[in-house]
Amino acid sequence: MQTIYTKITDIKGNLITVEAEGASLGELVQIERADGRSSYASVLRFDARKVTLQVFGGTSGLSTGDKVIFLGRPMEVIYGDSLLGRRFNGTGKPIDREDECFGEPIPITTPSFNPVCRIVPREMVRTNIPMIDMFNCLVKSQKIPIFSSSGENHNALLMRIAAQTDADIVIIGGMGLTFVDYNFFVKESQRLGFADKCVMFIHKAVDAPVECVLIPDMALACAERFALEQKKNVLVLLTDMTAFADALKEMAITMDQIPANRGYPGSLYSDLAVRYEKAVDIAQGGSITLISVTTMPGDDITHPVPDNTGFITEGQFYLKDNRIDPFGSLSRLKQLVIGKKTREDHGDLANALIRLYADSRKSAERMSMGFKLSNWDKKLLAFSELFEARLMSLEVNIPLEEALDIGWKILYQSFHSEEVGIKEQLIQKYWPKACLHK
């Protein structure tokens, strides 16, 4: 038998406080209003008989005498094949104007996957983007963010990755999206041909902040079931985790929590980590690969959100000036696949290209300061132009093997074979044969 409580003592923003007993954290609550409407909330915290609830859809029209019913179960989302091709809001309701979605209700808050059942990542995820495939390989079950400067088109990069990987299912979690962003995701998924294997959970900028916090949990709960029960390789794309953190910040301020760095709650690190740790490669099962977007306010990489994220994830892609910056990017799992799942020259060639590109930046700096350039400086600057145009541009869309061949051609056009610092046996095998020492 469910107990009905009618003593709401405080309404503040999207949070209400009710006097009740026996509540548990994360428990789902139904609120029946005097006008006949009903809404849902979840338990955020409790102190003796005072229980704080976050109300989905806002508290507009709520009165202190409305009925509050604790349902004895956590927030749930529908799981099943019927999700594919559908779009949902932060409470799990369809927003694509189609029929109601039917499936198995599953809780959205579950522990991270059992470490005993995890396996060491060993499969490369190909994106056909040279700055990822060649220099910072994406590995199946990796958790990695895209650190995006202001004004960068990170959404287009996400959709390219979604379309060009071999993932069985793509789940997109959008937080704080404008209508333009939301429409872009819908149209691009259709244009690129993966809409039928895509599930979207969308929180728009005009929606309640409490719904924003639920988006990653819903996306990852469904991904975990697809990976575990159907052995699917699932790609989860979350954008924007800074909007997620801002929603946490707003809720913490409303609850009068003592703020930490720049007003964010002291639990920010844990709140991020518990989501990122859902990435997994399951023994005799599927996998979850997680790519997120973290925008950096004021291009500040020391901002609490990217700063905490960097300690949790396995590297990052640094998007700047419409390129993936090789010096700010890192994949901590690339050594598991480079040379093992890829061509033997991959590691040496990538290292040589990045080393020479770093030297070319120094030459460009000397040129800008008016210093006289040596012949070596001129070679480096010519190399830099070729490298940026043929490999760094995000317009380039080629498989890894072709990117490696282009890398050799760029070296051949810019240097003598003795100048690039690559092992002689690789030079003999891969250096263009027209002139071995040119």
From Swiss-Prot:
Keywords annotated in UniProt: ATP synthesis, Hydrogen ion transport, Ion transport, Transport
InterPro entries in the cross-refs: ATP-synt_VA_C (IPR055190), ATPase_F1/V1/A1_a/bsu_N (IPR004100), ATPase_F1/V1/A1_a/bsu_nucl-bd (IPR000194), P-loop_NTPase (IPR027417), V-ATPase_su_B/beta (IPR022879)
GO molecular function, one term: proton-transporting ATP synthase activity, rotational mechanism
Pfam name, any one: ATP-synt_VA_C
Highest rank taxon of the organism: Bacteria
Keyword Transmembrane helix carried by entry: no
Listed GO biological process terms: proton motive force-driven plasma membrane ATP synthesis
Gene3D superfamilies: 3.40.50.12240
Positions of transmembrane segments: none
Family: Belongs to the ATPase alpha/beta chains family.
Purpose of the protein: Produces ATP from ADP in the presence of a proton gradient across the membrane. The V-type beta chain is a regulatory subunit.
Protein name as catalogued: V-type ATP synthase beta chain
Organism: Chlamydia trachomatis serovar A (strain ATCC VR-571B / DSM 19440 / HAR-13)
Lineage start: Bacteria, Pseudomonadati, Chlamydiota, Chlamydiia, Chlamydiales
